[in-house]
C-alpha cells in the first residue's frame, strides 16, 4: 500500500507504565519523558497526516509543518510551543494551480517544492501561492521514463538536496516491461541547473521477481524508506528486507548490511493475498515487516521501525488501524556503524508509528492513536523520548 493509494484515501520503558514499552537487555533504549507538545487542529484538518516535516528558517526559528489531506494547504506551527503560526494555501487550478500534490519540501517560505501526483513534475512555489517555476521529471537523460512521486513521511522518503542537486524518490515502474525490478530506479538525481536527470546507483533488491510484480499483491511489498546522514550517505530500508543499503554520494559505493529485529523473523511476502479491500487492509496491518528508517543527527544514531505480527480478528476498522500506524511496533537503534545497540517495543494501539520527528532533545512520537484512551481528534500530541545508554561507563 504505497503513496498513490495513501493520497487517494479521503523510555526508559517502564514495565509498570501503559505509556511506555518493554525494557530489554541492551546497550541503549528509548526512555519516555514527561515532556509533550500539543498542536490544536482546525476543523478541516484530520490526524491522517501523510507528510510532516520540521523546518528551521534562516533566523533559526523552528516549526512543525504538515500537509492537510483535505485541502491544498500546508499547516505551520511553532515547534516548541505548539502554537499555530499560519497556513500556506495553493490553488488547484489556474495559472498558479498545482492540482493534487503529495508532500513537499521547504527550503524557505518563498521556496516550497510540491511534487505533483498527476504529472511528472515538481512545482516550486512562493508562500503567497504564486508559482515560481516547474521542474519537469518525465525521464532520465538516458531515456528511462519516470513516475509522479510523493515526498512524504508516512512512508519516509522525502525530497533531498545535497551539493546543488535534488534527489527524488520513485516507486516500481511497470512501464519498464519484463525487467521492471532490474530497471526501476529507487531515487533519481536532478541537476536543476543543467536540467539533467540520472538514476541513483541503486535498484530494488530481489524481494520479488519481475514476474511476481505483475501478480496480485497487497501493494506494499516494495515499499521502502530512505534517509540521508551527515556523511553524505543515503541509507535505504526496504520493508520486506532485513538488510539495509548504504550508498555513498562521493563514489557511489553501496554496502549491504544485515540489520535484524529481535521481534520478527525474516519478513515474508504474503502468498495469495486477499483481493477485497477489508481483507487486504487486515493483511497489511497484520503481516510482520520493517518500516521507516530515520537518522537522528543530534545523537548520531538511526531508528528503524519494525512492525510485529498482529492478530486483528475481532477488530472492525482495518483501514483506521493501518492509517494510524498499525497495532504493534518496535524501534531499533543503530549506531553510526549500523550496529544494533538496542530495540524498544511500544505498547499496542498507543502511538502512531508514522508520525514522528527528531528534535534537539530527543525523538518525538505521536500518541494520538484513535484507540488510545486519551485520543482527541482535534489534538495532535507528541511525546518526547530520550536516548538512554544503559551500559555507558
Listing of model-derived features with the role each one plays in the protein:
Residues 127-163, 169-177:
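Asp-box/WD-like beta-propeller blade repeats and closely related beta-sheet repeat scaffolds
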Residues 83-113, 117, 138-150, 346-352:
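Blade-loop segments of beta-propeller domains
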Residues 285-334:
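Loop/turn-rich, solvent-exposed surfaces of beta-rich toroidal or solenoidal domains
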Residues 41-74, 291-294, 301-307:
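Beta-strand-rich domains and repeat architectures in extracellular enzymes and scaffolds
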Residues 50-59, 102-107, 152-163, 217-230, ...:
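Structural signature of eukaryotic scaffold interfaces centered on beta-propeller domains
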Residues 25-50:
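A short helix->beta-strand "capping" segment at the edge of beta-propeller domains
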Residues 181-195, 242, 319-337, 378-391:
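Beta-propeller blade signature
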Residues 95-96, 260-275, 339-359:
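Conserved blade-ending motifs and adjacent loop-strand segments that build the rim/top face
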Amino acid at each position: 500500500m504505497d503513496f498513490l493509494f495513501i493520497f487517494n484515501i479521503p523510555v526508559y520503558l517502564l514495565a509498570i507504565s501503559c505509556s511506555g514499552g518493554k525494557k530489554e537487555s541492551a546497550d541503549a533504549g528509548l526512555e519516555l519523558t514527561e515532556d509533550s507538545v500539543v498542536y490544536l487542529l482546525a476543523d478541516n484538518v484530520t490526524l491522517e497526516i501523510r507528510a510532516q516535516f520540521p523546518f528551521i528558517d534562516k533566523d533559526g526559528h523552528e516549526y512543525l509543518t504538515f500537509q492537510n489531506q483535505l485541502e491544498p494547504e500546508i499547516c505551520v506551527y511553532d515547534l516548541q510551543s505548539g502554537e499555530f503560526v499560519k497556513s500556506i494555501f495553493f490553488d488547484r487550478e489556474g495559472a498558479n494551480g498545482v492540482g493534487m500534490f503529495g508532500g513537499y519540501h521547504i527550503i524557505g517560505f518563498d521556496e516550497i517544492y510540491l511534487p505533483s501526483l498527476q504529472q511528472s513534475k515538481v512545482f516550486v512555489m512562493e508562500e503567497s501561492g504564486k508559482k515560481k517555476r516547474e521542474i519537469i521529471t518525465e525521464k532520465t537523460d538516458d531515456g528511462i521514463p519516470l513516475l509522479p512521486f510523493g515526498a512524504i513521511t508516512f512512508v519516509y522518503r522525502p525530497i533531498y538536496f545535497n551539493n546543488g542537486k535534488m534527489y527524488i524518490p520513485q516507486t516500481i515502474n511497470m512501464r519498464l516491461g519484463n525487467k521492471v525490478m532490474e530497471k526501476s530506479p529507487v531515487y533519481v538525481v536532478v541537476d536543476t541547473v543543467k536540467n539533467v536527470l540520472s538514476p541513483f546507483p541503486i535498484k530494488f533488491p530481489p524481494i520479488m521477481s519481475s514476474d511476481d510484480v505483475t501478480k496480485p499483491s497487497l501493494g506494499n511489498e516494495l515499499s521502502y524508506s530512505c534517509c540521508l546522514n551527515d556523511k553524505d550517505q543515503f541509507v535505504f530500508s526496504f520493508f520486506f528486507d532485513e538488510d539495509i543499503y548504504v550508498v555513498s554520494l562521493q563514489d557511489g559505493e553501496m554496502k549491504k548490511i544485515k540489520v535484524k529485529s529481535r521481534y520478527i523473523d525474516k519478513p515474508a511476502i504474503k502468498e495469495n493475498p486477499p483481493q477485497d479491500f477489508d481483507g487486504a487492509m487486515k493483511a497489511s496491518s497484520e503481516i510482520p515487516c520493517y518500516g521507516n528508517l530515520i537518522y537522528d543527527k543530534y545523537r548520531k544514531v538511526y531508528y528503524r521501525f519494525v512492525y510485529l505480527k498482529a492478530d486483528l480478528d475481532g477488530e472492525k476498522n482495518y483501514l483506521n488501524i493501518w492509517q494510524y500506524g498499525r497495532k504493534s511496533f518496535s524501534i531499533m537503534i543503530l549506531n553510526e556503524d549500523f550496529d544494533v545497540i538496542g530495540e524498544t517495543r511500544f505498547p499496542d494501539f498507543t502511538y502512531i508509528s508514522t508520525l514522528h520527528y527528531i528534535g534537539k532533545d530527543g525523538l518525538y512520537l505521536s500518541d494520538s492513536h484513535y484507540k488510545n484512551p486519551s485520543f482527541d481528534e482535534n489534538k495532535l500530541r507528541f511525546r518526547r523520548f530520550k536516548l538512554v545508554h544503559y551500559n555507558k561507563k
